[in-house]
Regions:
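Electropositive polyanion-binding surfaces
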Residues: 153, 158, 163-166, 181, ...
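Short intrinsically disordered, low-complexity coil segments enriched in acidic
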Residues: 2, 485-486
Length: 486
């Protein structure tokens, strides 16, 4: 074990490089500038300091000049050399010059809060976490007296760095989670989550706060909401979906048009600003989907119950409601808080069967003729919207999507290609319609003619960045060859 630790401790200069101050040995080095950034480390101990907002302007640091900085740390770095190298030809036929900067770390501003995952090794009363990570070249020394209960030799664990003393070959740390035996499904899944600092459980106080939220809808809750509880409403989701995020409502109007509602759960009604649940959601940022499980942003009572649009349950929602002609033209639109009660829960296969049979299949008396006709009509409208969208210059980014089927223990048993059909497009088109309607409403200050308003309110739009010039350049020869062949 000692041999391994010394080997990873690095070269002689490595000890000096961990001094906190910029040492006198560097007086001959000219410092071009100082930058602050995040460490991105390789398995060999090399470091790239990534500067926020400047991903293509990183600084290379040799293993001997890292001063004990590790992957994910925030550091100050002195840039000591810079040169320009010819880059790839850009889309305008010129070659962009690439900056190649080198430097050394002069201060560790903040240690990373992300744990490192490895295997616990114990010899006598000494303990280490042996690293298996591609961005952590050093094992972590653990104080034997701090080992958590249940931690045994050979187990996978997650550890945080406490510090790296001058002259020591490895950093010191402590174990924050015992993940289990390597190779077991739960262990490996938890290891993935731990490596990316994704919590797979909620603290008891967060769970308790969510459990205190009432699931009863009162007249007070309905005040100011448009009532869709008696309007035909349904959801279409994957077969294995546990929460139902959005729903569609459908109603024929006397003038021959259709009233179509796109509804999502009104999470803001339940998760109030500044509450412990709100703060936890901000920390998590999003739900994370693994092959065999979901790591939710909100506790189960919220994501799978209160905010899941389950059939035959009254729900508080936020909605985009449009009046649409049979030709797919939008006549009116409305946005606001609503209340719904979903009548049906379909999976994509079930909805597809109705579409392909023109509403005649499946022969299930529990599925009313009204919802069959609604799905068939909505599909025709969705195809019209889709055709119009592509005619206006939309690009399809559809690629084959692979799905992994697992058994009850989480073991993969089958990999298959997910086939996208009309039922998927139906949901996709109406979700896009809702998003686009909101963006147009803000940009035009509510005008129906689609013309922009200079006095429009400030809004956050999703705008794709400019294509990478090097990638465009590399596409040119391929496109030319393809066109010549045809």
């Amino acid at each position: 074990m000692q041999k391994r630790r010394n080997r990873q401790g690095g070269e002689k200069g490595g000890r000096k490089s961990r001094d906190k101050k910029f040492g006198s040995r560097q007086k001959s080095k000219r410092v071009l500038e100082e930058v602050t950034g995040k460490v991105q480390m390789t398995r060999d101990g090399y470091v790239f300091v990534i500067i926020e907002g400047e991903p293509d302007n990183d600084v290379f640091v040799k293993a001997s000049k890292t001063r004990g900085a590790l992957n994910g740390d925030i550091v100050r770095c002195a840039v000591t050399s810079e040169r320009k190298e010819a880059g790839e030809a850009n889309g305008r036929g010129r070659k962009d010059a690439a900056r190649r900067r080198e430097g050394e770390i002069i201060e560790i501003v903040e240690r990373s809060h992300k744990p490192f995952v490895g295997v616990l090794h114990i010899v006598g009363r000494q303990a280490w976490v042996l690293m298996q990570s591609r961005n952590m070249p050093y094992d972590i020394s653990i104080d034997f007296n701090t080992l958590p209960e249940g931690a045994k030799r050979g187990m996978k664990v997650a550890a945080l760095i406490d510090g790296w003393d001058k002259g020591e070959p490895t950093p010191k740390g402590h174990i924050v989670d015992v993940l289990g035996m390597p190779g077991e499904n739960d262990t490996e899944m938890h290891a993935i989550l731990a490596e990316y600092a994704l919590p797979y459980r909620f603290e008891p106080e967060v769970e308790n706060a969510a459990d205190q939220i009432s699931d009863q809808i009162t007249e007070k809750d309905l005040k100011g909401r448009r009532d869709f509880r008696n309007t035909l409403t349904f959801t279409i989701d994957p077969t294995d979906a546990k929460d139902f995020d959005d729903a569609l409502s459908f109603k024929k109007l006397d003038n021959g048009n259709y009233e179509i509602g796109v509804h999502i759960a009104d999470v803001s009604y339940y998760v109030l600003p500044g509450t412990i649940v709100d703060k936890e959601a901000q920390e998590r940022g999003t739900s994370v989907y693994l092959v065999d499980r979901t790591v939710p942003m909100l506790p189960e009572k919220l994501c799978n119950k209160l905010c899941s649009l389950r059939p035959h349950e009254e729900k508080l929602t936020f909605s985009v409601v449009v009046e649409m002609t049979p030709r797919g033209k939008i006549e009116n639109r409305w946005f606001g808080r609503t209340a719904i009660c979903s009548d049906y829960r379909f999976d994509y296969d079930g909805a597809q069967q109705i579409i392909e049979s023109d509403g005649k299949e499946p022969a299930d008396p529990a599925i009313g003729q009204d919802v069959r006709e609604a799905i068939v009509t909505l599909n025709k409208l969705a195809l019209t919207l889709r055709k119009r969208r592509f005619a206006s210059g939309a690009i399809s980014f559809e690629r084959p999507e692979m799905k992994v089927e697992v058994d009850a223990t989480g073991k993969p048993i089958r990999v298959y290609e997910k086939i996208t059909k009309e039922a998927n497009w139906l949901i996709e088109e109406f979700m896009l319609l809702a998003n686009r309607s909101v963006a147009e409403f803000i940009a035009t200050s509510g005008r129906m003619d689609g013309k922009a308003d200079k006095k429009a309110k400030t809004f956050v739009y999703r705008v794709h960045g400019e294509p990478n010039t090097e990638k465009i350049a590399s596409l040119g020869p391929v496109s030319y060859t393809h066109l010549r062949a045809h």
